[in-house]
Amino acid sequence: MLKTLRSAIFAGIYIGTAGFGFLASGIQSETYGSLVGAVLFSLGLMAVVGYKLKLYTGTAGFINKNEIGQLFLILLGNIIGCLCLGLMTRVSPMDIQAAAQKVLELRLKTGALRCGLLGIPCGLLMTTAVTFARKGNMLPLLLAVPLFIVCGFT
C-alpha cells in the first residue's frame, strides 16, 4: 500500500511538472502555444510510463475488478504529488497565474457534464497510447497528448 502511494505521489509530481511546462509554454498564445505545451506535457506522461508509476488515468483503463479499491489510493497520491509541485511553483520566477486562470475559467464555462463527456475520448486515446508505450513504442504517447489537448478533450 505504501509503495503504491509513493508511486502515485511521484506520478503526480511528474504530471504537475508537465502541467507547469504546459502553462509556461504560452498556452495563452492560442494554437501554437498549446501545441508546444502539449508536446512538453507528453514528457511527463512518458516518465510516468517509463518508470511504471501509478497515475489514476493510466491505471483506470487497465485495473482488475479486485483492485478497484486501489484507484482511490492512486488518486489521493496523484493529488498529493500535484499539490506538492503546485506549492513549489509558487517560488518560481515564472508567472503562470494568468494561464492557469484562463484554463480554469474555460473548464468552469464548459461545465462538469461536458468536461466529463470530453474526458471519454481523452481516456480512450490515453489507454491506447499507454498500451503501445508499455510495449516499448512511445510515439503514440507523444502524439496522443497533443491530439487530445488540441481537440479540447482535456
Please place each PLM-identified region on the residue numbering:
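Alpha-helical transmembrane segments and their helix-helix packing motifs
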Residues: M1-T154
